[in-house]
UniProtKB/Swiss-Prot annotation:
GO cellular component labels: endoplasmic reticulum; external side of plasma membrane; plasma membrane
Molecular function as annotated in GO: signaling receptor activity
Gene name linked to the record: Vpreb1a
Subcellular location, principal: endoplasmic reticulum
InterPro entries xref list: Ig-like_dom (IPR007110), Ig-like_dom_sf (IPR036179), Ig-like_fold (IPR013783), Ig_sub (IPR003599), Ig_V-set (IPR013106), IgV_Light_Chain (IPR050150)
Family recorded in the similarity comment: Belongs to the immunoglobulin superfamily.
Its job: Associates with the Ig-mu chain to form a molecular complex that is expressed on the surface of pre-B-cells. This complex presumably regulates Ig gene rearrangements in the early steps of B-cell differentiation.
This protein's name: Immunoglobulin iota chain
Residue segments, region Complementarity-determining-2: 71-81
């Protein structure tokens, strides 16, 4: 029976079927032209936003989604191609929130904005090492 549990956990881990983070966004936000707006993305409580990068996408009517930016920290972020610096990311790790700020709002900023999260590669490697350690420990206990 122990082998079955280990095998199922391993399959779930390798296929990405383990507990996945859920994000929630408010359905609507509005502001005036020229102003600054901050959109939020809440990560489910069973995950810590501190170990995730937040990805933001914009979809204008009649256009495919386009990548705006990735934000992990002030020193670890990436702006999408041709995305002006008036689009910026941030996090509130205490409240488990990610933010997209858009300053100097323009008419073309009217769009649907999506957030997504992904493990930072260094954190993913650390978790894989921990998993290997747990797997070895489980093997020793059998």
């Amino acid at each position: 029976m122990a082998w079955t549990s280990v095998l199922l956990m391993l399959l779930a881990y390798l296929t990405g079927c383990g507990p996945q983070p859920m994000v929630h966004q408010p359905p609507l936000a509005s502001s005036s032209l020229g102003a600054t707006i901050r959109l939020s993305c809440t990560l489910s409580n069973d995950h810590n936003i501190g170990i995730y990068s937040i990805y933001w996408y914009q979809q204008r009517p009649g256009h495919p989604p386009r990548f705006l930016l990735r934000y992990f920290s002030h020193s670890d972020k990436h702006q999408g191609p041709d995305i002006p610096p008036r689009f910026s990311g941030s996090k509130d790790t205490t409240r488990n929130l990610g933010y997209l700020s858009i300053s100097e709002l323009q008419p073309e900023d009217e769009a649907v904005y999506y957030c997504a999260v992904g493990l930072r590669s260094q954190e993913k490697k650390r978790m894989e090492r921990e998993w290997e350690g747990e797997k070895s420990y489980t093997d020793l206990g059998s």
